[in-house]
């Protein structure tokens, strides 16, 4: 259902407010560069510091601007099941193709709680769900056997796996079947992830290098592993540099270097990346031939 290079879109703010005009142009550029789907209001989009109304507005704008050219997977996660459902219903009404639903964070449910959370969402909304597993942020990890139990639900169609454990791809194939959509959530591990059966990456780096990331994904899908490895070598310093300080600070800094009039604006508690981080981004952009 979903595959290829899928940017987890940044949300541009200017003087603290959503810069809708720039965002619409950014969506067009991403599609023109070969991104195969778009994810607004994920972690990289600073969804944690948006109001519910603002969050839903950004999702609507993304869907409007995409105009059906590529699927839109709306960020809909919350540690409050009722709020996650509210986001899903709003995204479905706006025309989203799927919801990206992060595991509930901070309150740390057990595996039974995770099943109950996702069953409540699927019982009350028919929008397809991609489960988002990122234990480093949520302090909760969905186990392959738990995911397998959820994979039997028609509207749970895939996972964004940012567990950092590439062997999970094989374990999840065993529990969920080979047709369950597995998307890497780590740019730096995407090559191994794809080789083991993944079908794409929900990417931070694609914000800055959408064309190269799309080319990398196409090479993997075509089985051109030598070409994919060459692109991995080209992009790897950028994958690392974009996490050399708290994300999405480095990726927004990179965009001020590479994308016209991109605003240098983050919402607290996020702050601008350090001088060392900015230098790492500069060097990585040069290595990738972007700036």
UniProtKB/Swiss-Prot annotation:
It catalyses: L-aspartate 4-semialdehyde + pyruvate = (2S,4S)-4-hydroxy-2,3,4,5-tetrahydrodipicolinate + H2O + H(+). The keyword DNA repair does not apply. SUPFAM superfamilies: Aldolase. Pathway: Amino-acid biosynthesis; L-lysine biosynthesis via DAP pathway; (S)-tetrahydrodipicolinate from L-aspartate: step 3/4. Pfam families: DHDPS. The active site is at residues 132, 160. Its main location: cytoplasm. It is an enzyme of class 4 (lyase). GO terms for molecular function: 4-hydroxy-tetrahydrodipicolinate synthase activity. Homotetramer; dimer of dimers. GO terms for biological process: diaminopimelate biosynthetic process; lysine biosynthetic process via diaminopimelate. Its EC number is 4.3.3.7. The keyword Amino-acid biosynthesis applies. Signal peptide: none annotated. Pyruvate binds at residues 44, 202. This is 4-hydroxy-tetrahydrodipicolinate synthase. The gene is dapA. One of its GO terms (cellular component) is cytosol. The record marks 43, 106 as: Part of a proton relay during catalysis. It comes from the Bacteria. It is found in: Cytoplasm. Keywords: Amino-acid biosynthesis, Cytoplasm, Diaminopimelate biosynthesis, Lyase, Lysine biosynthesis, Schiff base. InterPro entries: Aldolase_TIM, DapA, DapA-like, Schiff_base-form_aldolases_AS, Schiff_base-form_aldolases_CS. Catalyzes the condensation of (S)-aspartate-beta-semialdehyde [(S)-ASA] and pyruvate to 4-hydroxy-tetrahydrodipicolinate (HTPA).
